[in-house]
């Protein structure tokens, strides 16, 4: 696995950062975001876009001509903005997850070191009070996909609850530079 750090800066100010890896999980090219934080300002969305664009650029270099799975743990519904432009994002409101999708949630939670805490029907990792990584993104006036907040109804982020989410970056979208913009 490659450990990669991405920073989003505005002048001298650090506006966001992420730690991710590019690896193959069972042969599948994967971009795993272990930790990402974006300042909670009016410019938060542009910082998130810059971070994701850099990660997609790296994924293209590592896995040319291949679809890449983006997987992470979300703290808030706004975190779904990181999946803009991706295909088959899971979980999604009103969608009954298939066995293969639940298997991917288990693989990702195992990779994140918390497989025993995953409810593979809801994709929620139950917190145990310890520090837990994930994608922390909140921005004023950000538009989130309708209904995703239902995944966070019984959610306690301060306890360490996280939502395992993933989607597919298509090879042609990576090559065309259309993701993260």
Segments and roles (model prediction):
Residues 1, 60-181:
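Terminal substrate-recognition subdomain of acyl/acetyltransferases
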Residues 1-41, 59, 74-76:
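A conserved beta-strand-loop-helix scaffold within acyl/acetyltransferase catalytic domains
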Residues 7, 37, 46, 70, ...:
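Generic hydrophobic/packing signal
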Residues 13-19, 50-55, 144-151:
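Short amphipathic alpha-helical surface micro-motifs
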Residues 31-37, 51-69:
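Internal, hydrophobic cores of structured domains that mediate oligomerization or house catalytic pockets
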Residues 42-51:
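Conserved acetyl-CoA pyrophosphate-binding loop and the N-cap/start of the following alpha-helix
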